[in-house]
From Swiss-Prot:
This is ATP synthase gamma chain. Keywords: ATP synthesis, Cell membrane, CF(1), Hydrogen ion transport, Ion transport, Membrane, Transport. Belongs to the ATPase gamma chain family. Produces ATP from ADP in the presence of a proton gradient across the membrane. The gamma chain is believed to be important in regulating ATPase activity and the flow of protons through the CF(0) complex. It comes from Wolbachia pipientis subsp. Culex pipiens (strain wPip). Its main location: membrane. It is found in: Cell membrane.
Length: 290
């Protein structure tokens, strides 16, 4: 049995850990609310943009549309793997990387050119041994994501070199459910998990005048904007999932520390009682010998 001093020190250490996990849980909850608000605004924007492109695509010549979207060429891929810079969020980082590995390895096995961009240092640390280093193009910090930063990144990479752009990220469903998914953001598709269908409304009942009067130019511009907006929205989805996963992980840690403290308190009291009983027996035995 451990000594009273050892038990007391262990209880003190666990209480210190409990304070930290409680604070982290509260911070994650606050960040989750902020992430959800940003995500809601982003979904509204990308859903409206998606609706406009859908309407233009209906009125465009199919051969022209195929040329704009590069539908017939799938040789060059750019893949974004979005996770976190930090841990303490359960299997959040590893699940996204593991999910992406299977899909990426299939592309590489079929002799496709694949470049990978990691968002999050933990994602890179988890994935660097799973992929060939020659396929890793960049590693980006997942903190402080803004639309301007995403626009600069997209411009720096030059997405025109790639026929397909895919994003692996953790989709936020609710506080207790986040799921790794794959989203193709180039070429544009009428089906997307990033949009909110409740705010998408068809625009085909209206008559529009385009300026400039060149539907090819307009569609190219809008689909490029859509790629940037989609990547930004996926990053916000991932941030919400990360904060939710960390909040749940810290809540679980708090429960575990409470259980440990209860067990240690019981053990401490029993040890203390045993020590007092032993002292009393020794005192009584000494008195009787006198």
């Amino acid at each position: 049995m451990k000594s009273l001093k050892e038990l007391s020190l262990r209880i003190k250490n666990i209480k210190s850990v409990q304070k930290i996990t409680k604070i982290m849980q509260m911070v994650s909850a606050a960040k989750l609310l902020q992430s959800q608000k940003k995500l809601s605004n982003s979904k509204l924007h990308i859903s409206k943009l998606h609706s406009i492109i859908s309407s233009l695509a209906l009125s465009a010549d199919q051969e022209l549309l195929a040329r704009i979207l590069n539908i017939n060429n799938e040789d060059s891929f750019l893949v974004f793997i979005i996770a976190s810079d930090r841990g303490l969020c359960g299997s959040f980082n590893s699940s996204v990387v593991k999910f992406s590995q299977e899909h990426i390895n299939k592309l590489i096995a079929n002799d496709k050119k694949v470049d990978i961009v990691f968002f999050g240092k933990k994602a890179f640390e988890t994935g660097k041994n799973r992929f060939n280093s020659k396929n890793i193009l960049k590693v980006e910090n997942s903190k402080g994501i803004t639309l301007k930063r995403v626009e600069a990144l997209v411009s720096d990479i030059d997405l025109s070199k790639y026929n397909k752009v895919k994003v692996f990220y953790s989709k936020f469903y609710n506080t207790f459910m986040q799921k790794p998914i794959l989203e193709t953001i180039k070429p544009w598709s009428k089906d997307s998990l990033l949009i909110d269908n409740s705010v998408v409304s068809p625009l085909t009942d209206y008559s529009y005048e385009y300026e400039p009067q060149n539907i090819e130019f307009i569609l190219k511009s809008l689909t490029q904007d859509y790629v940037t907006a989609s990547l930004y929205s996926a990053l916000l989805e991932s941030a919400a999932s990360e904060n939710s996963a960390r909040m749940v992980a810290m809540e679980s840690a708090n429960r575990n520390t409470k259980e440990m403290l209860n067990k240690l308190a019981l053990l401490y009291n029993r040890s203390r009682q045993a020590a007092i009983t032993t002292d009393l027996i020794e005192v009584i035995g000494g008195a009787e010998s006198l």
